[in-house]
Amino acid sequence: MKLADCICQMYESMKKKFLVLTILMCTFTTTLLNGCGKKQNATPDNETLQDTETVTDQTVLEEQADSVEEGISYTWQDITVTLPQEWEDSYEIVEGNEGFSIYQKSSYDKNQGLGFLCGFTHIGEFRKGALGETLIAYADDGSCYYWIEPTDLAYDENDASSQKEYEEMAEMVPQIVATVKISGDGVHTNADEYVLPLSDKKPLTSEMLDNLNDNELMIARNEIYARHGRTFQNEYLQSYFNKCSWYQGTTMPEEFDESVFSAMEKDNLSMLEAKEEAYESEHPYPKKYEYGTVIEEDLNADGNVEQIFCSLMEQKDGSYVPIVTINGRAFDISKDCQLISPVTDCFYVTDITAADGELELAFLDYGPSYDPETYFFRFDGDMEFVGSVDGFPFKDQNDGINGFVNDGQVIGRIRTDLLETAYLNGYWLLNEETHALEYQEQEEYDYISTTAHQLYEKLPVRVTMDENAPEVVMQKQAEVYFLKSDLKEWILVKGKDGTKGYMQVKNGKVVELGKSANNVFSDLNYFD
C-alpha cells in the first residue's frame, strides 16, 4: 500500500472524532505506513541566505528555501526540508518506502499514528484529487513529489497541553513546505502552475481525469496549447497562463499550427475533449432559455413536468421584474427581485445540489454600474427566494468558467479595493434545511483575472500570512501578479520568475517597504 493511501486512511479514521476508534485506526494505519520504516533524526543546518536572479524553476525553489530562517535540516533520498529550530525534541520523523512523515512527538509516543503533521512522498506516477495531497514537483521520468497534510484532528483531544503544542506546530507546516529542496535529475518545481504537468510527457488515462471538474478540464486542455506559445482570446485563459513562469505567449490563435503537437499530445487532447463532453452530459444543468418561450422542467422533484413561461415587465421607475408563470399560474417575485439592467435575452434553470432533486430559476442583472448579480428562486407550489450571488456563474457569461462545479455551492465573484480594484472568487453554499444560499467566508480568496504589474524594487514577502513568518525576497522585475488575498491586509504576490509570497498592505502602503503601493507597482487599477 502506498504511503499517501495509508495516510488518507488515517485521515478518514480521524473524522469520526471518537478518540478510542481514532487510536485503533491510526495504530493500524501507522503500521501500514511505516512497514519496514524507521525513525530518523534531523541535523542542524546553518545555510546562509541566497539572493540571486536565476529564474529556472528549480533554482527559484532553492532560493526560496534558502531564504527561510535557519533550522533543523532533514534529508530523505532526494528530498530535503528544514524544520523550525524551536521544534527540537518535539517532533518524530518516520520513513516509509516512498517518503517520510513528520509527527508531534508527544502524541506519537502515546500512539504511533497520532500527531501527524505532514508528509512528503515520491511516487512513480501522477494522480489527482487524493485527500490532503498536494503536488509540489514532477520529473521528466513521470514521477511526482507530493506533500500530504492532515484533514482533521490528529492529536489526543483529552490532553490540553498536547493539543496546544500540536496546533502551534501545525501552523508552522507551511513554512516547512517553503523550505523543500529536491535534488533529483530533471525535476520541475512549478507543479502548482499546471493542472496536468505531464500531459506533454506521458499518455493520459481516463482514471487520471476522473477527479477533474469542468474548469480544470478546460484549463488542462488549453495547457497543451499554451506550452507551444499559443495566445488566447478568452480573457480568463490568457490571464491564467500569463501568471505561469513557463508561459510565453508568442503565437496568435489564427496563426497557430497544430502540427507542432506530438502524437501523444494529440491523443491527450482527444482524451480531454472526450472527458469534457462526458462531464457536460453528466451535468446537464445549468440550462439556458430565452424569455418569452414555454419550457418544461420538473422544478420540485415531484415527478411531474411543469410548464414554465418567463418574461420581463418594466416598472415605472425603469427597473424590471421577471414575471414567472408556472402551469398557468402567475407569480409575483418583485419583493425579492428588482432588476436594474437585466440580461434581457435569457434566464437559466440550475441544479445547485443534486441532493434535493430540485431545480432553480435564475435571473441575471448587470446592476446600476456593471455590478452583476444572479437571483435564484425555487418552486414548491409557490415561488421561494433562494438568494442572490454576485456575478454571473454561467460558462457562456463568465469566460467559460463554470460556477456550479461543487455540489451545493455556487461560485460567484466579490470585489476588493485593498490595493487596487479587483475581483476574486466568492462562494455561496446552499443550506439544505432552509433552502437558502449563504455566503461562505474564506481564509483567502483567489483573484479571477489579474493584469501584470512591474515591480520597481526588491520586495520582501512572507511564506505565510504572518508578519513573523520567514521572509523571501522578490527581485524587481517586469511582471508580477496578485494571486490571492484575505481581503484584510495580505496579498499573495507572484513574479514571472516563479518566486512568490505574501505581502502585507495597510492604508494603501506596502508594509515591508513603508511605501505607497503606487511607488512599488505599476498600473494599479482603481474604479468606482
Model regions and ranges:
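Sec-dependent N-terminal signal peptides of Gram-positive bacterial secreted proteins and lipoproteins
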Residues: 14-41
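N-terminal, intrinsically disordered, polar/charged segments of Gram-positive cell-envelope systems
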Residues: 38-74, 187-195, 280-297
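Secretory pathway targeting signatures of secreted, lumenal, and periplasmic proteins
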Residues: 82-130, 135-136
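Surface-exposed amphipathic alpha-helical segments
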Residues: 151-188
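Amphipathic alpha-helical packing elements
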Residues: 208-247
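Short aromatic loop motif centered on NTY/YTY
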Residues: 345-378, 383-452, 457
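SH3/SH3-like beta-barrel superfamily modules
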Residues: 472-527
